[in-house]
């Protein structure tokens, strides 16, 4: 027993820390001044002060580590800094006659700290510690008593450096389960605040956590909380990571919500661009093995089932360069929220998930400019205040045909143009050879962002946002083939030109009508376009020496226009609840046509639809329990039907660390992107409107259960989900005849087939995240399955094309001074595919023979497992001790050059099916230079 008591005593003493003294009691120097930026846990700040200014501190390290310091000091005295830190965190300090400071969580802690045995402290301070305690214990809590209790508090969270609002910042009242999240303009409302002397803990991804202590006077005014970016923490005291400074944050109170910090993406490995949507692919539940798509495959869904909003308007084309990069410039983005499922009644029109992107408003304090250079593109941006009430932001990114761009472009085009037939599985065609290519490639992409924000007063905000992105892929080339009938050369000029993109804009008015009523009203426009021209102009010498000129080809066009208006309102009805409600209207015009030889329109679709509706949602707190029931109503005029979507989510805080949560809801989708069965014969996909017959309105039901356990340093999260999908659509374009570009004297007939089916997806996601310290990162694992059932393929369910059973992701970041090292490793089990298992030949009278594939069951085969290791090194460029002006980054994609299969090509040789794997990118390095002024 004695041994146990001594051991327990030792453990207790080990957690009680004091700053080290050098010699004698008269070395205290709390009048020294500090002129630098500090961000760190309080215990480490005290250690720094003790070593630098020779001050003795006595405190409980476990207690003090919970409090953070984030401030810029300009020749402030140490004693004033200590007083301010204690005031901000609602803790106590006591100074003894010899200058020793006790830092206390509660006044009574002084007794415990003073009664430590002599061996617990250094001999030089023992005598002083045992002296009578006569000094005053100072704290603002002792001086200020609360005037109001159980009241509602409104405020706004902004960036300290730029004045921009911070959406989706988390606010929590310390010591309670009372929380709030800022809206898109940074405003928040806290209900049932215990007292007007409470302490607010404010956190936001990429920013330093702030502790804001209320006073009766401050609580009665409009509260503005200014936060400091984590990148400012470049001083002698550098601690990477109170909550809110990570690249990714998971909102533990809300169901299936992930928040991204665009400014911190530079530290992650990339293929050539900081990429918002690809960063999300590093989280569990979002597939990370689709290199050819920056779109989100969320929980067994497809990218078109993910609603992507940028400043309120829908973006239909979310990628560049055949899907390798997302279409969003991180320099124009302030905040990104992804809802992986069970999302609010505020959002609709998609079956799987929502990605809500908020653009930057522009610096409201000083002008700033920057440039990013990589092996792929040039990116310039600028922001400036126009006056004290308005600001402007612009950004422009354009690719250039450097080695990285050409590597990706050649990887794609070399595998998508050398085909002689047009048939897919079940149709005629095979792969043929060509000779003497002469290619003049002219390909590029660009995107442009602009935003103007006007704030006439503290009640109104007006903003105009604009986006334009476009890709041009020109793989046209000349082809020469020696004539077998003469000494001349048969020549052909092949056109293969694809352009696609998206233009969008929005005009928004935000108004705080009262402290309890807030509204956002928005009008938006979005235009997706895709054009592809494929043709051949040939000069052929016949047996008589006569030159015959022929022209053939096809053109494919898809255009979607979306004009929308919506108004979202938020009303605080009590200290414990609020109502979200609003209305929306959208007019969509979708065209798709397929033309042969400039004259014959094989497909000509032109549909318009009007969508009207509204929603209402209640957020009600019952202490630790939060319930959020909601309802969304939509009238869709193409079917002339009404669609009701009930939604519900709940969370229960067992304590301040452990949270349980659940969600369910019904979701409808009216605009669909269908994918070709044979991607080599035209566009990979195109958008169409549901018509209620051949293309039904898709629907889904989500069921989600989860739990999270969060400490100061770690987050442990688990979520399980089940989705039931109905009225899914697949598209097949079958070709009969042998006409087309390579057989100009014959005609082809195209048969459209829309197949309808159903499906389900289920899975469980695990996340372990380290948020604090020089080393941060996370490990994610997903066990999932996705199955579909279409009658055309039989009566059984088959694996969906996006079915990936196992995904493991390890993300690691380490910061050492100005250096940041990162490494990511992704493993995914193989995707399913349909494979030819044989072939047969049909003799056609007068037209030769045609060979057809015999295919296996739908998606019964699987590719080999996917895995790759990426790494990056980033060095921050510093102008002064607190000002970051840029960075240099080296990124290495697929370090061990893994051959991961993209898809498989087939040809027929002697009635034998020959397969060839087409792989994703191998080892790819990249260099990035970022500068800002």
Tell me what each language-model feature is.
Residues 176-187:
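Short, acidic Ser/Thr/Gly-rich low-complexity loop/linker segments typical of extracellular
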Residues 46, 89, 98, 105-150, ...:
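Short, acidic, small-residue-rich periplasmic hinge/interaction motif at the N-terminus
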Residues 189-192, 267, 313-339:
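Short acidic/polar hinge/loop motifs at secondary-structure boundaries
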